[in-house]
C-alpha cells in the first residue's frame, strides 16, 4: 500500500475510479476537479485478488485504502466494466440519446465498508438495426469533455482504445456513437 497522505495534502473532493477489465485506475480530485494524484493497479474485474465482491473490496483497499482513511467524506465514483454484469454490481445501460442528468439519475450504489458507498456510472447503449452498441467508461470521459467545454454543443468526440469510439453529441447529450476494432487490430 502507498504511504499515507501527509497532513499538508490538498483537500480531496472526489475519489474517481476507472475500473476496466484488466486494470484499475484511481484519481484523487480537488474541488475544482483537478487531479491531485493518480494510481494504477492490475486489479481489473478479471484480475481481482480474490473472487467475488470481497475481491473488489480488497482491490480498492490495496490501491486507495489510505485515501479512504484520510478523506472519509470524499465520495467514491466508478465507471467502466465494474458496472457490467461481470462487475461488482451491474449498472444497467442507459439508451441514447441521453444527457448526463439521465446517467446521474441511474447511478448504482454499492456499500464498500466502514459506512461508505461507491457510486457506479451506467454505460450507454444504442440499438441500431436491431444490434446493440455499448460503451462503459467512455460516457464519463465524454461528460468531462462537455463539462470543460472542450466540445461545442454539436460535435464529434473520438475516444481511442481497444474498442475505439466516435460519439456524436448535441446540446449536452450523447445522441449516437460508433465502435471500431482499431485497438484490437493494432494489438494483434
Question: Model-predicted segments: where are they?
Answer:
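Glycine-rich phosphate-binding loop plus the immediately following alpha-helix
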Residues: 46-48, 125-188
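Gly/Ser/Thr-rich loops at beta-strand to alpha-helix junctions
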Residues: 20-25, 81-85, 159-165
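Short acidic-glycine loop/turn motifs at beta-strand connectors
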Residues: 30-34, 114, 168-173
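Short glycine-aspartate micro-motif
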Residues: 14-18, 75-77, 155-159
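Solvent-exposed alpha-helices and their adjacent loops that cap or buttress functional pockets
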Residues: 6-9, 69, 111-113, 147-152, ...
